[in-house]
Amino acid sequence: MEGKGRVLVQLLMLACVLEVSLCQHWSYGWLPGGKRSVGEVEATFRMMDSGDAVLSIPMDSPMERLSPIHIVSEVDAEGLPLKEQRFPNRRGRD
């Protein structure tokens, strides 16, 4: 019984692998081998140059509604500056 189940699982795995490897998907405008027809590329460039697809940012954007970032002071719980603790051997830099 164990051998039959193993063979069944192997056949199912083989069927799945063959299904994925034998099928081929071509996107619209693409030819086999990943090449595009010259007419499609030219039409794409013309569409990009027309300027009709330019999106404008709305005046009330969500970024404006975000609260400002609060800066954390560089002092630890004991009141010592963290810069001095991180870089004890540095001189002349603040």
Swiss-Prot record:
Q: Which Pfam families does the record associate with it? A: GnRH (PF00446)
Against InterPro entries, the record matches this protein to:
GnRH, Gonadoliberin
Q: Which GO terms describe its molecular function?
A: gonadotropin hormone-releasing hormone activity; gonadotropin-releasing hormone receptor binding
Per the record, the domain of life is Eukaryota
The residue range of the signal peptide is 1-23
In the record, the note on similarity to other proteins reads:
Belongs to the GnRH family.
Q: Which PANTHER family match?
A: GONADOLIBERIN, PROGONADOLIBERIN-2
Designated name of the protein: Progonadoliberin-3
Classification lineage: Eukaryota, Metazoa, Chordata, Craniata, Vertebrata
